[in-house]
């Protein structure tokens, strides 16, 4: 009996040991972080990123990064496709990007990305009431003798938190005149105190914002079309609010609900790579058709006083490819044509600028141009 009793006790001990092992779930730890904003990301504190023991998995508490700096296409923050009531607002677009790329926003984003069933809302305090009122771009830009200029590539980028903020930054004649002067809209005899912002914004080519500016010169009204490439704009939002609705998966992992996490959000709008081929037919001597710089000079792309170098702004304004440094590659006659050439250039974003894909490497662009051939 004593031997049987000892065997029974050993059996109970072994059963108890394996019983403990069997009831402990496999814990998938979320990323820890020293950045605590609505969640610490420390599994030992019960904060962001901690695992709540479930039989089926882990619940992750989203832990937002204190600063989020991104770059990319304008379409990530402004709906360039839809119009009217179907147009998505900036809050919705940022929320969609957070859901698709949580690793860019949360310290434990890689874990959150593997979980289904949770959703995101964003509050950037964007003013829904437009302050750009008056005539539409199609009307004011058609006024006779409208002077056009584009913000120079050497000018500084503009940090805004909304289009309303952009207008508020141009709240004096002095500020408006200064930005016009930087855009080749210089009128030495215009009344410096008469510069005003008028009418609605325009938007063309998917990458150029148009502002209507008026000023008084010799008793008459000057009408100006000030173009600002969207790649000159950085969206900067202090304390962007992010809230997450919990998932409710019966098996596997889950994401916990959190409200009003805040981050400092900066978005550098990238350069659109598409080019618009020139439509004018400038004169080109037949003897110059084999020399790329002379072909580019005929297009008006070279610097004043130095025809061996390209003028970045002249090239940009012609092709609609802004804030790049350009170098010539080739100008090759199109086969079977006497007056049409394929032009190839290399374009590299200037310092602090990027392409829509977030890179700033040099890329080759090409387009066709037609000339009026002269000489024998």
From Swiss-Prot:
Compositionally skewed regions (Gly residues) per UniProt: 38-51
Pfam family, one: MpPF1
Lipidation (N-palmitoyl cysteine): 31
UniProt-listed InterPro entries: Lipoprotein_p35
Membrane topology designation: Lipid-anchor
Keywords: Cell membrane, Lipoprotein, Membrane, Palmitate, Signal
Domain of life: Bacteria
Subcellular location: Cell membrane
Stretch forming the signal peptide: 1-30
Keyword Disulfide bond assigned: no
Region annotation (Disordered) ranges: 35-59
Lipidation (S-diacylglycerol cysteine): 31
GO cellular component: plasma membrane
Family: Belongs to the p35 lipoprotein family.
Protein name: Lipoprotein p33
The species this protein was found in: Malacoplasma penetrans
Organism phylogeny: Bacteria, Bacillati, Mycoplasmatota, Mycoplasmoidales, Mycoplasmoidaceae
């Amino acid at each position: 009996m004593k031997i049987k009793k000892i065997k029974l006790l050993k059996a109970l001990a072994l059963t108890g040991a394996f019983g403990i092992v069997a009831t402990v779930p496999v814990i998938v730890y979320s990323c820890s972080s020293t950045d605590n904003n609505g969640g610490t990301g420390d599994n030992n504190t019960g904060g962001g990123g901690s695992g709540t023991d479930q039989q089926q998995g882990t619940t992750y508490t989203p832990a937002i990064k204190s600063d989020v700096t991104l770059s990319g296409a304008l379409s990530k923050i402004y709906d360039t496709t839809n119009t009217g009531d179907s147009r998505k607002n900036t809050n919705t677009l940022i929320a969609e990007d957070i859901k698709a790329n949580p690793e860019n926003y949360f310290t434990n984003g890689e874990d959150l990305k593997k979980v289904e069933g949770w959703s995101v809302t964003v509050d950037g305090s964007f003013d829904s009431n437009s302050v750009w009122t008056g005539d539409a771009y199609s009307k004011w830009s058609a006024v006779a003798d409208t002077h056009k200029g584009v913000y120079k590539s050497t000018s500084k980028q503009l940090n805004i938190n909304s289009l309303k903020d952009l207008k508020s930054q141009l709240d004096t004649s002095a500020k408006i005149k200064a930005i016009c002067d930087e855009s080749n809209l210089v009128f030495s005899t215009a009344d410096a105190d008469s510069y005003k912002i008028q009418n609605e914004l325009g938007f063309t080519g998917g990458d150029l914002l148009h502002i209507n500016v008026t000023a008084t010169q010799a008793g008459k009204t000057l009408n100006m079309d000030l173009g600002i490439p969207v790649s000159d704009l950085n969206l900067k939002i202090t304390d962007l609010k992010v809230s997450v609705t919990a998932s409710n998966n019966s098996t596997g992992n889950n994401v916990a609900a959190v409200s009003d996490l805040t981050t400092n959000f900066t978005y550098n709008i990238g350069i659109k790579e598409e080019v618009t081929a020139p439509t004018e037919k400038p004169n080109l001597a037949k003897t110059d058709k084999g020399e790329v710089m002379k072909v580019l000079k005929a297009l008006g792309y070279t610097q004043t006083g130095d025809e061996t170098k390209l003028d970045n702004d002249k090239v940009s304004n012609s092709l609609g490819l802004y804030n790049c440094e350009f170098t010539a590659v080739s100008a090759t006659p199109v086969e079977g044509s006497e007056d049409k050439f394929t032009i190839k250039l290399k374009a590299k974003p200037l310092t602090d600028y990027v392409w829509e894909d977030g890179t700033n490497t040099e890329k080759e662009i090409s387009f066709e141009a037609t000339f009026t051939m002269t000489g024998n």
